Amino acid sequence: MAFATINSSVPSSIPAIEDAFAAEPALKKRVYDAIAHTPQHGLLFEDIAKYTSSLLARTATAPVRPVEVVSDGPAMKKRKLQNGNATSAQSSGDLKSDTSLQFYMQDVSFAVPQRKKLTLEVTAGFLRARNQTSKEVEFGVPLDNIQHVLCLPVPEKNQRQFNFCIIPQYADGVNSPPEGVAAPDAIVWTVNDGPPKAAFSGNGQQLGTDNEETADKLVQRILNDSLPRTKVVRPDEREFVSAMPEAHRKGEKAFHVKAFRGSKEGYLFLLSTGILFGFKKPLVFFAFENVDSISYTSVLQRTFNLNVVARPTSSEETQEFEFSMIDQADFSGIDGYIKKHGLQDASLAEARRAKRYNVNGAKGEDEAAANEEGAVEEESELQKAQRELEDQEDEDEEDYDPGSDSDSDGSGSSSEEDDDDDEEDDEGDMEEDDEEGDRNLVAEELGSEAEDVPAEEL
């Protein structure tokens, strides 16, 4: 009777359980049955239901990323569709939490993934961008997910500027995320050359007021101190510098090469860790370990195309990226960069033999050099053969006996005569040498007249 009394006191419905298991009626019934049998666990089940509801609400409010399709590339270049069941690359709760700041810079111009001015923030675990009006965090990335950070001069600007490119894991345009994991976006922002105007440490102290450190160097230092897996990479003259100087800033060297990917115009940067094509979405970064081969096609008098075959780290399938309309003036520098880093130059491979250099009758500077190099190699083989032949002749001359061929007047002898000579050598070499010596002396003294003197007169 006591059990029946307790059982009847259990409410027929508990709001938390109803909300948590509304989509699972069978599971909800089992929860109620368990509470009926052990009423003392009712509060525990209710707490579990509340926690389940909070998880469902967090997943439901997770942002759904749109599909980005690159029309001028293979199917692997499509960004994967992400849905509410996908596990985000970072927890939005952690990203937006009020953790202590280590650095922030106001009025920073972002270009990717959004074009607007935001506040750049670096916390103990995240790099993020905060809306300056609403104070909401717009986007960000965990610091330990960042694989590459680049600081590159912005091409074709009258005022010198630098683009910082943050490339998280699976955001390089080559490697796709695992199934069910959201593909993160690359992040690009711009800073002007000169001292920072609104940069602060985590405690609010303004940085760069002594004018000893430019804005780009300050941001680079902060990132290098904060990033656990990588460092900031900048262009290096020892890697590549364009043959054409910066058009809008006279006297300044250019580190970019203008190119097209399909109809999209952009810039190629050849760096110490890989090749970047930017700065519009989607950025593509070819780390050296993902480059399968690089070749040249459509080599014309003024332009050529660069083909990069990339292989994702966790896949054997390759993707091909073509960058067109590259100025011939940069052919030599690009080719030197490719050879320096041991990237496979497959332009002469069998599969590309129809698209070899000089396909349209034009010859680039490095192509001519390559042909000359091949000629040198070919010539060296001929020289080697000639040298071996000359060495053999030298050996024959060392073994040559001046008197042995006098009977033939230098015209050589038949094989039968050689056999006779061998037999005569066995019988008595000394006598033959004396006789031949006498004949040689007579010929020496009389010259051509020796032919007219009868033997008996001698």
UniProtKB/Swiss-Prot annotation:
Cellular component GO terms held in the UniProt record: chromosome; nucleus
Compositionally biased region (Acidic residues): 367-380, 390-408, 415-437, 446-458
Swiss-Prot/TrEMBL keywords: Chaperone, Chromosome, DNA-binding, Nucleus, Transcription, Transcription regulation
Keyword Metal-binding appears in the UniProt entry: no
SUPFAM superfamilies: PH domain-like
Polar residues bias: start-end ranges: 82-95
SMART domains: Rtt106
Family: Belongs to the RTT106 family.
Protein function: Histones H3 and H4 chaperone involved in the nucleosome formation and heterochromatin silencing. Required for the deposition of H3K56ac-carrying H3-H4 complex onto newly-replicated DNA. Plays a role in the transcriptional regulation of the cell-cycle dependent histone genes by creating a repressive structure at the core histone gene promoter.
Protein name: Histone chaperone rtt106
